[in-house]
Amino acid sequence: MFEATTILGYKGEYNGKKCAIIGGDGQVTFGNCVLKNNATKIRTLYNGEILSGFAGSTADAFSLFDMFERILEGRKGDLVRSVLEFSKEWRKDKYLRKLEAMMIVLNTEHIYILSGTGDVVEPEDGTIAAIGSGGNYALSAARALHNYASLPPREIVEHSLAIAGELCIYTNTNIKILEL
């Protein structure tokens, strides 16, 4: 189920201004068949202050989005507290523990991966996170471009997802991007 997409999140600073960017490809795969090539797997939450994206089962991901959005509203947009509460709820609920989806959530201050087991992972570098079947390709490309090229963050995300789309059969180059 996790072989259906690539999502890449980037949090950083450019020209003295903090930024957060998330991008994803548009491919939806069922077995060895591409069902759709222009799906949207990223969205804004909490009045456009939080970016999010998912990989995995679409129905499961929407359940997680709804739950996370409710918690985020209750915590008045506090991403750190919302992520921790979300993880606690996820682990307590037997139904949620069986969901086959992962999420990236970020703003200009924080970036997290929410795993299918309810784990919360903050990326080692605190800047770049990737999930999905092409996630490792996108992550590698993004780290290289971040460290060795002088590109704007949006271009880093675009180029990294394009590279993943060239290498991963479950990822395409129909890229959508959101930014704060």
Swiss-Prot record:
<keyword id="KW-0378">Hydrolase</keyword>
<dbReference type="InterPro" id="IPR029055">
    <property type="entry name" value="Ntn_hydrolases_N"/>
</dbReference>
<keyword id="KW-0915">Sodium</keyword>
<feature type="binding site">
    <location>
        <position position="165"/>
    </location>
    <ligand>
        <name>Na(+)</name>
    </ligand>
</feature>
<dbReference type="InterPro" id="IPR023333">
    <property type="entry name" value="Proteasome_suB-type"/>
</dbReference>
<comment type="function">
    <text>Protease subunit of a proteasome-like degradation complex believed to be a general protein degrading machinery.</text>
</comment>
<dbReference type="GO" id="GO:0005839">
    <property type="term" value="C:proteasome core complex"/>
</dbReference>
<keyword id="KW-0888">Threonine protease</keyword>
<protein>
    <recommendedName>
        <fullName>ATP-dependent protease subunit HslV</fullName>
        <ecNumber>3.4.25.2</ecNumber>
    </recommendedName>
</protein>
<keyword id="KW-0963">Cytoplasm</keyword>
<comment type="subunit">
    <text>A double ring-shaped homohexamer of HslV is capped on each side by a ring-shaped HslU homohexamer. The assembly of the HslU/HslV complex is dependent on binding of ATP.</text>
</comment>
<dbReference type="GO" id="GO:0004298">
    <property type="term" value="F:threonine-type endopeptidase activity"/>
</dbReference>
<comment type="similarity">
    <text>Belongs to the peptidase T1B family. HslV subfamily.</text>
</comment>
<dbReference type="InterPro" id="IPR001353">
    <property type="entry name" value="Proteasome_sua/b"/>
</dbReference>
<keyword id="KW-0479">Metal-binding</keyword>
<dbReference type="GO" id="GO:0009376">
    <property type="term" value="C:HslUV protease complex"/>
</dbReference>
<keyword id="KW-0021">Allosteric enzyme</keyword>
<dbReference type="GO" id="GO:0051603">
    <property type="term" value="P:proteolysis involved in protein catabolic process"/>
</dbReference>
<feature type="binding site">
    <location>
        <position position="168"/>
    </location>
    <ligand>
        <name>Na(+)</name>
    </ligand>
</feature>
<dbReference type="InterPro" id="IPR022281">
    <property type="entry name" value="ATP-dep_Prtase_HsIV_su"/>
</dbReference>
<dbReference type="Pfam" id="PF00227">
    <property type="entry name" value="Proteasome"/>
</dbReference>
<keyword id="KW-0645">Protease</keyword>
<feature type="binding site">
    <location>
        <position position="171"/>
    </location>
    <ligand>
        <name>Na(+)</name>
    </ligand>
</feature>
<dbReference type="GO" id="GO:0046872">
    <property type="term" value="F:metal ion binding"/>
</dbReference>
<feature type="active site">
    <location>
        <position position="5"/>
    </location>
</feature>
